[in-house]
Every structure is written in structure tokens, then in C-alpha cells.
């Protein structure tokens, strides 16, 4: 290859590289609207997280609220069941009807749930306990603990006389026993 051929080849190669570098002769392009759906820094989160059963396990849904809800208020919403849109996504509730029977008391870093029935006997199953525990843990519990560190003390058969058992909401929305 002669130096003349090499020079011509180099000129063609540089011309090809220069045209493919992505610099447009028309100037900057418009980017469109700013990102949306992201909470602005400093804005208060005005939503509540409820847990329902779905085709692939426990699923969290977020609903807008005017102010933070106590665990009792969040559980009242859970007891109403999924909305029409949530049902269309395949979400259901394994929590049996218990309006007026569920007692909820929140203290610093903990929530006491007094539930009707006994878990594992057909009256309440593990999915229902997960729904109740995780919904309560993600509500406005005193003490500012992360939801995964809130103790949910479950009292069965509408009594407080028996020793409760404690669970926490796991990262996947399932109730995890606390061993002490």
C-alpha cells in the first residue's frame, strides 16, 4: 500500500468517524416535560400501604390519604377489602369479616392486635395474619421505627389474658415470627 493510498484511506476513515459522532448540526434537541411521579424533597408522603393477597403472594397497594393513618385506621381500610381496580389486578383479601371485632392498640414501636378466632384453624390463616401485620406495621406507629422493626403482638380469641405471639412484617410482606 502506497503512502498516497494510505492517506486517502485515512481521510475517508476520518470522514466516516466524524459523521457518526452524534453531533447534530441543528443544535440542542428539546427534552420534553420534567420527570413526574417522584416525590419532591420535603413533601410529606400522604399515602397508606395496605396488603392484599394476589396470584403470586402478598402484594402491597398504596392509596392516597389526607393525613397519616393510625394502625387502627389503616386496618379499617384493609377490612373494607380491595377496590374495584385492585380486584381487577387479581387482588383479594384472606382476612375474614371482623368489623367491630378487631381491636388495635398502638404503642411505641409496637401494635397489639386482638383478633377473633385462632390462627391455623380455618378461622384465620397465615396470609390473613400477614395482611393484618404488614398493614399495621406500615401505618403511623409511634416511635418512628422502620416497618420491618415494628412488633405486632397477636392476641387470639378476643382475649388479652393469653400470652400474645409476636411477628414483624418481612421485606416481602409476610409475617415473620419474632423469637425471644
What is each PLM-predicted segment?
Residues 1-180:
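Bimodal "functional hotspot" detector
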Amino acid at each position: 500500500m502506497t503512502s498516497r493510498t494510505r492517506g486517502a484511506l485515512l481521510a475517508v476513515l476520518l470522514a466516516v468517524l466524524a459523521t457518526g459522532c452524534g453531533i447534530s448540526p441543528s443544535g440542542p434537541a428539546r427534552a420534553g416535560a420534567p420527570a413526574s411521579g417522584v416525590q419532591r424533597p420535603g413533601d410529606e408522603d400522604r399515602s397508606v400501604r395496605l396488603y392484599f393477597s394476589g396470584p403470586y403472594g402478598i402484594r402491597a397497594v398504596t392509596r392516597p390519604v389526607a393525613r397519616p393513618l393510625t394502625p387502627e385506621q389503616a386496618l379499617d381500610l384493609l377490612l373494607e377489602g380491595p377496590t374495584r381496580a385492585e380486584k381487577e389486578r387479581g387482588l383479594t383479601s384472606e382476612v375474614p369479616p371482623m368489623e367491630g371485632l378487631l381491636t388495635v392498640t398502638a404503642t411505641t414501636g409496637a401494635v397489639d392486635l386482638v383478633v377473633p378466632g385462632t390462627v391455623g384453624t380455618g378461622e384465620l390463616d397465615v396470609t390473613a395474619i400477614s395482611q393484618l401485620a404488614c398493614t399495621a406495621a406500615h401505618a403511623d406507629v409511634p416511635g418512628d421505627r422502620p416497618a420491618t422493626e415494628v412488633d405486632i403482638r397477636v392476641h387470639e380469641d378476643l382475649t388479652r389474658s393469653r400470652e400474645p405471639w409476636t411477628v414483624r412484617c418481612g421485606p416481602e410482606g409476610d409475617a415473620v415470627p419474632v423469637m425471644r
